UniProtKB/Swiss-Prot annotation:
The gene is ALG2. It catalyses: a beta-D-Man-(1->4)-beta-D-GlcNAc-(1->4)-alpha-D-GlcNAc-diphospho-di-trans,poly-cis-dolichol + GDP-alpha-D-mannose = an alpha-D-Man-(1->3)-beta-D-Man-(1->4)-beta-D-GlcNAc-(1->4)-alpha-D-GlcNAc-diphospho-di-trans,poly-cis-dolichol + GDP + H(+); an alpha-D-Man-(1->3)-beta-D-Man-(1->4)-beta-D-GlcNAc-(1->4)-alpha-D-GlcNAc-diphospho-di-trans,poly-cis-dolichol + GDP-alpha-D-mannose = an alpha-D-Man-(1->3)-[alpha-D-Man-(1->6)]-beta-D-Man-(1->4)-beta-D-GlcNAc-(1->4)-alpha-D-GlcNAc-diphospho-di-trans,poly-cis-dolichol + GDP + H(+); a beta-D-Man-(1->4)-beta-D-GlcNAc-(1->4)-alpha-D-GlcNAc-diphospho-di-trans,poly-cis-dolichol + GDP-alpha-D-mannose = an alpha-D-Man-(1->6)-beta-D-Man-(1->4)-beta-D-GlcNAc-(1->4)-alpha-D-GlcNAc-diphospho-di-trans,poly-cis-dolichol + GDP + H(+); an alpha-D-Man-(1->6)-beta-D-Man-(1->4)-beta-D-GlcNAc-(1->4)-alpha-D-GlcNAc-diphospho-di-trans,poly-cis-dolichol + GDP-alpha-D-mannose = an alpha-D-Man-(1->3)-[alpha-D-Man-(1->6)]-beta-D-Man-(1->4)-beta-D-GlcNAc-(1->4)-alpha-D-GlcNAc-diphospho-di-trans,poly-cis-dolichol + GDP + H(+). It is found in: Endoplasmic reticulum membrane. Pfam families: Glyco_transf_4, Glycos_transf_1. GO terms for molecular function: alpha-1,3-mannosyltransferase activity; GDP-Man:Man1GlcNAc2-PP-Dol alpha-1,3-mannosyltransferase activity; GDP-Man:Man2GlcNAc2-PP-dolichol alpha-1,6-mannosyltransferase activity. Residues 1-84, 106-416 are cytoplasmic. Residues 85-105 dip into the membrane without crossing it. This is Alpha-1,3/1,6-mannosyltransferase ALG2. Its EC number is 2.4.1.132, 2.4.1.257.
Length: 416
């Protein structure tokens, strides 16, 4: 009987799912999109990813396992110097991409999964055959920009309205954390009747298990025992300066012998097309020089998956510096690699990190961060204890299996 039910379940046609994403680079949003696509593909769904920009040389390796199509990359990403008008350009690129997919690409699909930019959702209402739409909200976009002038407020007003209105047009809305769910309800007043479900990002543990860590001789100077690691994009909101300031504080807390064995690697996503990446990288280098940290810090830009796994395998702890991070995949990666995390005590890390068990949650100031780092130097066995607890937590709460089943259930429910 059970076998017959299993055969019946397998014989049910699997949905065809199309993912629409603005820029398939190397950020947390891209990591989630890839994991979601791979998860549905593993469940037998037909999956394709359409994006406005895709560079096989600047992407996650798993993207090469999926059919990725690109349209609209010729459209501008900004209006002039300094990345002005980026929001309008992102909306135009995504609307064009949706129109292209719907009317020129000859694609057949049952469900479209989009994220980051909701402006494309109304386009799919134009389809002859009704398409079901799942929108994954990483965080309300209107909260990710400043409005420090009248012109900026005037510019953002229609964009913010479009975001809220079109987000409400989705058939299913998912968010990445309880923190984001609360912010969603607080921000989108007209959508107060909608309770978005939380689908935590998972970790693609297969890629971590299959990689053999390589030696870090070319990245870490000889004689360094305490390797600190920061993984984040070169963006000011990621507060990478906190890691450098904590290092300065740490220098005053350690003996000269221990200090000489400390090294920080600042590894982050870096795209030369993004002005902020270029500027902030130079700002951080200048700060290192001014703080006399040159021989204690290595900057790594756009590193490979193998390098990242090797760094996580070898480091003493990870410094996760952004405040109010929407979720944050880096703490999961670190914990799975049995590496404790020191993170700011706000946002997603409050849900992923178990304080004093898998890492430390601290106030976003260099003194508290340096105190937490010092604990690992004074008590080396702490890394192993917290590392084991961290891996167990990831397996229990953020497994790929749980993510796959939950996502597949949301997709199939749309077609009932």
């Amino acid at each position: 009987m059970a076998e017959e039910q299993g055969r019946e379940r397998d014989s049910v046609p699997k949905p065809s799912v199309l993912f629409l994403h603005p820029d398939l680079g190397v950020g947390g949003a891209e990591r989630l999109v890839l994991d979601a696509a791979l998860a549905l593909q593993a469940r037998g769904c037909s999956v394709k990813i359409w994006t406005a920009h895709y560079d096989p040389g600047h992407c996650f390796a798993e993207s090469r396992e999926l059919p990725v199509r690109c349209a609209g990359d010729w459209l501008p990403r900004g209006l002039g110097w300094g990345g002005r008008g980026a929001a309008v350009c992102a909306y135009v690129r995504m609307v064009f991409l949706a129109l292209y997919v719907l009317f020129l690409a000859d694609e057949e699909f049952d469900v479209v999964v989009c994220d980051q930019v909701s402006a494309c959702i109304p386009v799919f209402r134009l389809a002859r055959r009704r398409k079901k739409i799942l929108f994954y909200c990483h965080f309300p976009d209107l909260l990710l920009t400043k409005r420090d002038s009248f012109l900026k407020r005037l510019y953002r007003a229609p964009i913010d309205w479009i975001e809220e209105y079109t987000t409400g047009m989705a058939d299913c809305i998912l968010v990445n954390s309880q923190f984001t769910a609360a912010v969603f309800k607080e921000t989108f007043k007209s959508l107060s009747h909608i309770d978005p479900d939380v689908l935590y990002p998972s970790l693609n543990v297969t890629s971590f298990d299959s990689v053999v860590p390589e030696k870090l001789d070319d990245l870490v100077p000889k004689g360094k025992k305490f390797l600190l690691l920061s993984i984040n994009r070169y963006e000011r909101k990621k507060n990478l300066t906190l890691a450098l300031e904590a290092l300065v504080q740490l220098r005053g807390r350690l003996t000269s012998q221990d200090w000489e064995r400390v090294h920080l690697i600042v590894a982050g996503g870096y795209d030369e097309r993004v002005l902020e990446n270029v500027e902030h990288y130079q700002e951080l280098k200048k700060m290192v020089q001014q703080s006399d940290l040159g021989q204690y810090v290595t900057f790594l830009r756009s590193f490979s998956d193998k390098q990242k796994i090797s760094l996580l395998h070898s480091c003493t702890c990870v410094l996760y510096t952004p405040s109010n991070e929407h979720f944050g995949i880096v703490p999961l990666e670190a914990m799975y690699m049995q590496c404790p995390v020191i993170a700011v005590n706000s946002g997603g890390p409050l849900e992923s990190i178990d304080h004093s068990v898998t890492g430390f949650l601290c106030e976003p100031d260099p003194v508290h961060f340096s105190e937490a780092i010092e604990k690992f130097i004074r008590e080396p066995s702490l890394k192993a204890t917290m590392g084991l607890a961290g891996r167990a937590r990831v397996k229990e709460k953020f497994s790929p299996e749980a993510f796959t089943e939950q996502l597949y259930r949301y997709v199939t429910k749309l077609l009932v």
